[in-house]
A protein has these predicted regions:
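C-terminal segment of classical bacterial N-terminal signal peptides
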Residues: 20-30
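Extracellular, surface-exposed repeat/solenoid domains
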Residues: 508-574
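Charged, amphipathic alpha-helical linkers/stalks
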Residues: 284-368
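Bacterial N-terminal signal peptides that target proteins for export
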Residues: 2-16
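Extracellular repeat-rich scaffold modules on cell surfaces
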Residues: 408-479
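Alpha-helical transmembrane segments that form the membrane-embedded catalytic/substrate-binding core
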Residues: 231-235, 266-295
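Hydrophobic alpha-helical bundle signature of multipass membrane enzymes
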Residues: 33-266, 336-406
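Extracellular beta-strand/loop-rich repeat segments of large surface/secreted proteins
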Residues: 441, 472-538
Length: 574
């Protein structure tokens, strides 16, 4: 039954915030000061993960269909066939046109293949050097490998082959992807027919349709609507599911998912806002499936299958990896979160973390607690105010690429306990975000954590056990550094400790030219280890304002070399 569009808009305005928002380059500095900040916010439909199975025909209101409810932010701009914000909608189509007009030959081919292939097959390239093993051991296949030089017939079919086999060696992984991306509840057909927003190529002749698809797109039915993008939804459902099972490729896979969305704009199929909406639906649907009690055994089987010789132990170094560059991935992913839209709504809304969203990080940050993963999502979320993204629960503002880099801010004492015996990210991980906040980082456990950001958090660092690598000059932030056990490794020259340094035990590892700069007092003890490097008489290993104590043990010094303590430095002498 089709519902009245005006009635839908009225319900939306009552049930959800419809403010629109924008994205700065820097990670939002919002901090969860108490656990109350991390509590989920209930939408008109309840919580997405609890009611995702209601995304079916006949459920067409924000109250009885979580996808319709999540996407109801679009009613700020369009409903009942009328534009409510012509400027945003005009920008939406203008951006779509510009993107199609600047389409390169390689982008044309890629977007064509994205269009024709099974939606799930599209994400295999995100596996990079593991794609060869996946194709072999999942019996993955496609019947589209090149783009034709002439337009396809209007009735040309999509892929007819099974994308991968659920009875293959990687069957559990294939089944989990199918459960997420091909369930009766994962589609966008219902919400599209509620919103009824016309495709961009039918709104403006400036949107240049991909020539190979011109006949197909011209013949599409009139109710083949734009918002949200179904391909993008499926891309994030598939990409995030694969990322759960293969967290070693987390950021690469979600970057490919975002690229699939971009491919839809390149082909002229979808507008940027539709792609942004598709990311939201795909993210929420994946979290719902991964949280569903019925899928827990399959979820574990998929992870285990991926971590065998069938996939992660069969790396193909000769295979191409389109997602090997971290900075390129980061720039691409984060730009596609907002597609250049500026904030146009309430920019002062606190971050919201949806119920169950933390499951998306469970395998990527396995050493954190459930609440800590929610805190990561909170401190890496987008600011409010961007078009479409301010849904009631907070799915639109999740920045999972940044979240995979660990905390964005420390608002309290955060203890990270890593067990190296469990392997993977439990054994070693790197936080790349620029940490802010007034909280303290406490490193415990046997694993190794690397801090690689330009950090400004003021609560200091305490190392109790394991290894903490300072991989940027400002990795330790602005507070005191206390070394009570484990290994503190300085890997960058001229690393600065902005507070005091206090070593009671453990091992401080420096290079001959590290020149650790301690801004205030240093209290020395424990072991100093010098790594191999060029030795020069009189080199400053560290400087400080004042010093008490000396190292109890010094290792790594070649024969004939010594350390010399002065009022403000520790020197290498011969």
């Amino acid at each position: 039954m089709k519902m009245n569009q005006h009635s839908w808009l009225q319900r939306v305005l009552i049930s959800v915030s419809v403010a629109v928002v924008t994205l700065p380059i820097a990670i939002q500095g919002a901090q969860a000061k108490t656990t109350d900040n991390l509590m989920p916010h209930e939408a008109a439909y309840g919580y997405f993960i609890d009611h995702y199975r209601q995304n079916v025909t006949g459920h067409t209101t924000p109250q009885n269909n979580p996808v319709v409810g999540e996407m109801s932010t679009f009613s700020t701009y369009w409903s009942n066939g009328q534009a409510h914000d012509p400027d945003i909608l005009s920008q939406n189509i203008s951006q779509a046109a510009t993107i199609t007009q600047q389409r390169t030959d390689s982008e044309a081919t890629r977007s064509y293949l994205t269009d024709r292939r099974d939606l799930r097959y599209n994400l295999i390239s995100g596996l990079g050097p593991y794609a060869t093993a996946f194709i072999k051991n999942a019996n993955a296949q496609t019947d589209f490998t090149t783009m034709p030089t002439t337009p396809l017939p209007a009735n040309a079919p999509y892929s007819k082959v099974e994308w991968a086999s659920p009875t293959s060696t990687l069957g559990p992984l294939v089944k989990l992807v199918n459960t997420t991306a091909r369930s009766p509840f994962s589609g966008t057909g219902v919400v599209k027919h509620v919103v009824k927003y016309v495709r961009p190529y039918r709104q403006s002749p400036q949107v240049r349709v991909l020539p190979a698809l011109s006949n197909v797109m011209a013949a599409a039915k009139g109710d083949d609507y734009d918002f949200p993008s179904g391909h993008t939804t499926a891309a994030f459902e598939t990409g995030l599911t694969l990322a759960y099972a293969v967290p070693e490729r987390f950021q690469e896979l979600i970057t490919r998912a975002s690229e699939v969305g971009y491919d839809r704009v390149l082909a002229g199929r979808h507008s940027p806002l539709a792609v942004m909406g598709g990311r939201m639906v795909g993210t929420a649907m994946t979290a719902a499936v991964l949280n569903d009690p019925e899928n827990q055994e399959l979820k574990q089987q998929a992870y285990q299958a991926a971590h065998t010789n069938a996939l992660l132990n069969s790396k193909d170094l000769s295979a191409s990896d389109n997602f090997s560059d971290y900075q390129t991935n980061r720039t691409a992913y984060r730009s596609r979160l907002t597609y250049g839209f500026k904030p146009s709504g309430d920019t002062h809304q606190a971050m919201r973390v949806p119920k169950g969203a933390e499951v998306l990080l469970a395998s990527r940050l396995p050493y954190l607690s459930t609440n800590q993963r929610r805190d990561v999502l909170y401190t890496t979320g987008l600011p409010s105010g961007y078009p479409v993204l301010d849904d009631a629960e907070g799915w639109g503002r999740l920045d999972l690429f940044s979240a995979a880099n660990g905390y964005g801010a420390l608002s309290h004492r955060v203890t990270v306990t890593m067990n190296a015996n469990q392997g993977g990210f439990n054994a070693q991980d790197t936080w790349r975000n620029n940490l802010t906040g007034h909280g303290q980082l406490v490193k415990a456990g046997t694993g190794a954590l690397t801090l690689a950001g330009n950090n400004h958090f003021t609560g200091g660092v305490q190392l109790k056990a394991g290894t903490l690598n300072l991989a940027s000059p400002t990795a330790a932030g602005k507070g005191n550094v206390v070394l009570n056990g484990g290994t503190l490794r300085v890997t960058k020259n001229h690393t600065q400790l902005s507070g005091q340094f206090h070593q009671t035990a453990g091992r401080l590892v420096v290079t001959p030219d590290s020149h650790l700069r301690i801004k205030h007092a240093a209290k020395l003890g424990g072991t100093l280890t010098l790594t191999k490097g060029h030795l020069k008489n009189g080199t400053k290993l560290m400087t400080f304002q004042t010093r008490t104590g000396k190292f109890k043990h010094i290792t790594g010094l070649p024969h004939g070399w010594h350390v010399h303590y002065t009022k403000h430095a520790v020197l290498l002498t011969k």
